[in-house]
Amino acid sequence: MATPHINAVEGAFAETVLFPGDPLRAKYIAETFLENVEQVTDVRNMLGFTGTYKGKRISVMGSGMGIPSCSIYATELIKDYGVKNLIRVGTCGAISTDVKVRDVIIGMGACTDSQVNRLRFKGQDFAAIANYELMNAVIESAKVKGTKIRVGNVFSADLFYTPDPQMFDVMEKMGVLGVEMEAAGLYGVAHEFGARALCVVTVSDHIRTGEKTTSDERQTTFNDMIVMTLDAAITL
């Protein structure tokens, strides 16, 4: 039952999918944390895998960069493959001075400069928020592991290289914790088609201070975030 962008067979995906932007990161997650792994799709090298984690079936697939790419894969996973839970896992740039590099941010809501949710909501503003059950599961997992997390709004940007850096001042004033490029679109798709979605990201750099993590620090923090998220996923 291939779609235009996924060539997996029916039933290839678990109900819960971890959803990093980078397909090679999806491969890394599958090979590092899952058992009995099978690659289930590879159209346009957007790799997807299904395996087990602590005995529960879990999938992981790349979403690509930005809301348009993420929305395509999220829509097909939900509508054509019956996926119920999509958890974006990735990195972001911090905005708030209270947020530090290596912190983990849970995107309770996603602001955006994209028009996609207005297009699907008849021109009105749509509250792009995470699913409470998914969010609570990850928060509880973080408590068990002692992982430092921040819960609040992220900003899903259409442009990586923004022509208006003064917008960062507005974001900080409004309490935005970090900037990424997918969550608002993912939340919109999930609400439209009756699925559940969440964005969990590590802070790889601080937009305001210029501080950046090293590659080793980034990998360690990412691994901790993935374990925390997988432990939450098996409770769903």
UniProtKB/Swiss-Prot annotation:
Q: Which UniProt keywords apply?
A: Glycosyltransferase, Transferase
Catalytic activities:
a purine D-ribonucleoside + phosphate = a purine nucleobase + alpha-D-ribose 1-phosphate; a purine 2'-deoxy-D-ribonucleoside + phosphate = a purine nucleobase + 2-deoxy-alpha-D-ribose 1-phosphate
InterPro entries, per database record: DeoD-type (IPR004402), Nucleoside_phosphorylase_CS (IPR018016), Nucleoside_phosphorylase_d (IPR000845), Nucleoside_phosphorylase_sf (IPR035994)
Establish whether keyword RNA-binding is in the entry: no
Which residues bear the site annotation Important for catalytic activity? R218
One GO term describing the cellular component: cytosol
> For this chain's UniProt record, which GO biological process terms are given?
purine nucleoside catabolic process
Q: Where is the signal peptide?
A: none
Q: What class of enzyme is it?
A: transferase
- Origin, by domain of life? Bacteria
Q: Which Pfam families match?
A: PNP_UDP_1
Q: Which SUPFAM superfamilies match?
A: Purine and uridine phosphorylases
Might you give the EC number(s) for this enzyme? 2.4.2.1
**Active site, per annotation:** D205
Task: State the disulfide connectivity.
Answer: none
GO MF entry, a single one? purine-nucleoside phosphorylase activity
List ligand-binding residues for phosphate. Answer: G21, R25, R44, R88, V89, G90, T91
- Any idea which positions bind a purine D-ribonucleoside? H5, E180, M181, E182, S204, D205
NCBIfam families, per database record: deoD, PRK05819.1, PRK13374.1
Q: How does it assemble?
A: Homohexamer; trimer of homodimers.
Job of this protein: Catalyzes the reversible phosphorolytic breakdown of the N-glycosidic bond in the beta-(deoxy)ribonucleoside molecules, with the formation of the corresponding free purine bases and pentose-1-phosphate.
Recorded family membership: Belongs to the PNP/UDP phosphorylase family.
Q: Could you tell me what this protein is called?
A: Purine nucleoside phosphorylase DeoD-type
Task: Give the species this sequence originates from.
Answer: Shewanella sp. (strain MR-4)
